[in-house]
Amino acid sequence: MPQIEKDYIDTGKMKYVFMDFPLPMHGQAMKASEAALCAGDQNKFWEMHDRLFANQNALSPEALSKHAEALGLDTTQFKECLESGKHAAQIKAAMAEGQKAGITGTPGFLLGFVEADGKVKATKKISGAVPYANFKTTIDELLSSKK
């Protein structure tokens, strides 16, 4: 991702939108996604996201609280958010959108354009952890087709 950010996002050639897609086979993935969004309520989404990915064996409710504490979050607010399921509908909507676009696993990437109505029209899909060169080829093809 860092090279894509440098070459395409930071230069304004493309925009990056992250959508949660917790897989049902991972029993704690949904709560982990909610935890990242609850951390986002306190402006720490990416910090929590990265921490959870780095600690995938520590996703129990107790571990999520410890992650929140380590990030300096207001733990009372974080726990209330997590227990309320405040972000569950948002995550389920993102999953439905991803499934509709053909995403079946993670990581999954949709590349496309923003239409006049503000909706993203995905024209290419990349599945799995692939090398930067694959992204570069696909992105460059899309960008040149839009000229």
Describe each PLM feature range.
Residues 1-69, 74:
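Structural alpha/beta surface segment adjacent to cysteine/selenocysteine redox centers
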Residues 1-7, 65-147:
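C-terminal cap of thioredoxin/glutaredoxin-like
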